[in-house]
Amino acid sequence: MPPLGAALGGSEDVRDVVHHVLALAGRTHDGLRAQRGMAKFATACVACHGADGKGNQQIGAANLTDDIWLHGGTEAAITESIVKGRINQMPAHKDFLDEGKIHLLTAYVLGISGQGKP
């Protein structure tokens, strides 16, 4: 995600968008700010995250409506993501991990996440 703070306007505009993102996620937010942030979100964020905030997974755009917050789901963390941007796509590992190692790694990650079996 590129830095979008300047594209949104000033810090108050960014804060409005942050509250719209919090609203999409069903988190505590300021309703007035979220309403104002909706228009800015539609201008700067919809192309990647979609109008519903579900994100385009094929390009690495996060789903803003779930409980998975790679860089934090607080107002401060979301603000930082918008202002500074994020580069967080994981490179492909198929060229140096065979199928067996991929399954083992998958099982390990699921195990430490508490999600159960693959």
Across the structure, where does each feature detected by a protein language model lie?
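Extracytoplasmic electron-transfer domains, predominantly the class I c-type cytochrome c fold
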Residues: 1-24, 56-114
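Sequence/structural segment immediately N-terminal to covalent heme-attachment motifs in c-type
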Residues: 29-55, 66, 79-84, 117-118
